[in-house]
Every structure is written in C-alpha cells, then in structure tokens.
Amino acid sequence: MTIILVGILLFNTTYVLSDNKNNFSKNKVEQTRSIFKQIEKGNWSLALRKTKKINNKILSDLIYWLYLNKKKNNADFYDYQNFITQNTNFPNKPYLQYLLEHKINTELISSKKIINHFEKNKPVSSFGKLR
C-alpha cells in the first residue's frame, strides 16, 4: 500500500522530493519512476542500485525503509540496526525492531553485540526476549 501511494505521488508531479531546497530535475523524476517500477516487479537489488545513482539521501532512505519493511529481504541485523539508529524519526520503528530481532544469528553476531543491543533497546518480540 505504501509503495502504491508513493508511486502515485511520483507519477503525478514534476517536482518530487526536495533535498536542500533543490527540486528533482525531470531526469531524476524519470529515474525515480524507474526505481518504483523495479520495486513493483520485486527487483529490489536493482531498485537499490538505481537509488544510489540518484544520490539523494531522502529518496535513498525512503527506498531503503520500504525494503527493510518487507519481511523477506537480504538485509541483516546490522542493516536494520544502522538504519534505525540513523533514522530515528521514520515510521514503523517497532516493526523494524521486530524484524531486526528475527535477523539475529548467534553464529554471526557476538554475544557481546547482542547483549549491547538489548541493553539499549527493549525487545519487542518473544523471539527478541529469548535472545
């Protein structure tokens, strides 16, 4: 649903997303449309690569937030942790925390780092409480 709403916004305006008071050029709007087309196709890896080429933090964070909100993705514990730490005002933070907790792999992440995370962040899922 979120993807559809953002897509509608992008398709119905010539100036979308502002960064440092510089509006997107028509070329960047077209690139952004292309990114959302890739997302609709489920091609997240290409969408994320194209996002980096536009070089706009707002758009990059938005696309990455949409990606992280998907239950099935290739993000790991650190991807979630870094995003949540750097983007404290983004919506759906409890759900991102929930997904982060399900990405904990004790074979890849040291006990110390897991303990440190939960000292700073209260678990939101039973899975997180077990860790």
Residue positions per predicted region:
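Classical Sec-dependent N-terminal signal peptides that target proteins to the secretory pathway
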Residues: 1-19
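Alpha-helical solenoid repeat scaffolds
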Residues: 18-131
